[in-house]
């Protein structure tokens, strides 16, 4: 069986994916790494042709999209380490040159701290470690300095937004993910620059959040960073909370931080006790009240599918396997992993899939830990579906509806940073050693050199 070619992908997209469940399974590439590398070349070529100098590509309109009034080159920064790892040297050098010559953070724009940290700060730090280019570290340090005012709240937990030029902050209503998903990046910046304030501020934010957990050990999904009061007391592992748990564990793995290890151990015990939901259809993680553990929802989705990866890192392979199998049932119930999937009814309730990486990420971690062929086979299925349903003339695009195959009009930067990277890694066993690197939540590998 040969890798899906462009003509086949277009045929599936028109005649198959759009017709929903009647579509036969797509052609799956034998050479998964080669298919992922070719997909990255196609995606980069489309961005280069239609959105150069901008943040992202509208891949149906063949037009650029910027996040703010002025672009921050989010796709080139997010994609650079993927280009390097896949050996696309000309494209990587093109991206690096464009970044160091054109990226400036001296801009009068208000940005979302969390997204800029995981994508841009994380991307710059990873690319610096891979290339040794001091200009990338200088950009990272300039960005980190401009983001520091977010921590100037009464609690030390960060505001949501900050103006890169003035330092003015806004957005007191935040969530555990946006508060607790900063320490890998700010900690690495501190280690590489010798300025400990970055790590201290981010760790204080994390510990302040942890200290506000409920008596049964859970956090809610929204908190006021000025008062420290929870404004939503629903608990789960999905969007708004997800990477908080990820970073509790990974900050111990990257920095050897015993405080983080203790916070992780306490938290995962509570999550597995209250949030996990063993059902006849498999193991899932739903939603509960943070104070009582009472079940409030049976919704799982594409973002929650990151959790098997974290369980692998924690050594809980049995639970990781079970949850990844459940995630795969969610994928095959339609033609990708819906943003929201009701596992009690086994159907999508919010059927969008914006090219997310999490289910693929978890398959790679399981493959790395177990060497079982099951996970690589999953990767081939994921790659085949992406080619069939999401490929366009200009790159790849999100699915607005996984049940019908209706396409949207955006190629998010994380598709290049994460989704294609994890597909390539699934097809390239041993390419990265998890004993020496830790991925941030945007799949930027950070190497412990201290």
Question: What is each residue range found by the language model?
Answer:
Residues 1-8:
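Bacterial N-terminal signal peptides that target proteins for export
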Residues 18-450:
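Glycan-recognition and catalytic cores of secretory/periplasmic carbohydrate-active enzymes
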Residues 1, 16-18:
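Coiled-coil-like amphipathic alpha-helices with heptad-repeat character
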């Amino acid at each position: 069986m040969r890798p899906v070619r462009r003509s086949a992908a277009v045929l599936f997209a028109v005649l198959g994916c759009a017709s929903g469940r009647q579509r036969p399974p797509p052609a799956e590439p034998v050479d998964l790494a080669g298919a992922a590398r070719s997909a990255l070349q196609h995606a980069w070529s489309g961005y280069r042709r239609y959105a150069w100098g901008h943040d992202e590509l509208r891949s149906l309109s063949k037009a650029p999209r910027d996040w703010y009034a002025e672009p921050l080159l989010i796709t080139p920064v997010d994609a650079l380490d993927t280009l390097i790892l896949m050996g696309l040297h000309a494209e990587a050098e093109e991206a690096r040159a464009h970044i160091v010559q054109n990226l400036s953070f001296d801009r009068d724009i208000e940005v979302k701290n969390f997204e800029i940290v995981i994508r841009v700060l994380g991307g710059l730090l990873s690319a610096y470690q891979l290339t040794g280019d001091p200009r990338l570290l200088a950009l990272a340090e300039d960005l980190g300095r401009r983001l520091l005012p977010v921590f100037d709240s009464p609690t030390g937990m960060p505001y949501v937004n900050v103006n890169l030029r003035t330092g003015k902050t806004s957005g007191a209503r935040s969530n555990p993910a946006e508060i607790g998903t900063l320490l890998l990046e700010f900690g690495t910046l501190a280690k590489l620059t010798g300025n400990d304030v970055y790590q201290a501020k981010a760790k204080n934010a994390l510990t302040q959040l942890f200290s506000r957990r409920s008596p049964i050990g859970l956090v809610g999904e929204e908190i006021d960073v000025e008062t420290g009061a929870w404004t939503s007391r629903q608990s789960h592992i999905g969007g708004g909370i997800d990477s908080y748990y990820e970073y509790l564990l990974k900050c111990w793995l990257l920095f050897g931080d015993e405080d983080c290890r203790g916070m992780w151990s306490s938290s995962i015990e509570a999550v597995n006790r209250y949030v996990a939901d063993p059902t006849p259809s498999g193991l899932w993680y739903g939603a509960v009240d943070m104070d009582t553990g009472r079940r409030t929802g049976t919704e799982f989705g594409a973002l929650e599918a990151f959790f098997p990866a974290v369980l692998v890192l924690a050594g809980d392979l049995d639970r990781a396997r079970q949850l990844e199998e459940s995630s795969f049932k969610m994928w095959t119930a339609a033609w990708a992993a819906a943003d929201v999937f009701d596992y009690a009814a086994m159907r999508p309730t919010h059927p969008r899939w914006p090219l997310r990486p999490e289910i693929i990420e978890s398959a790679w971690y399981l493959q790395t830990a177990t060497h079982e062929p099951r996970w690589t086979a999953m990767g081939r299925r994921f790659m085949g579906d992406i080619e069939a349903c999401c490929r366009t003339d200009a790159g790849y695009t999100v699915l607005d509806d996984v049940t019908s195959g209706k396409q949207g009009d955006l190629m998010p930067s994380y598709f290049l940073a994460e989704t294609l990277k994890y597909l390539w890694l699934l097809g390239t066993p041993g390419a990265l050693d998890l004993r020496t690197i830790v991925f941030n939540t945007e799949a930027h590998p950070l190497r412990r050199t201290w």
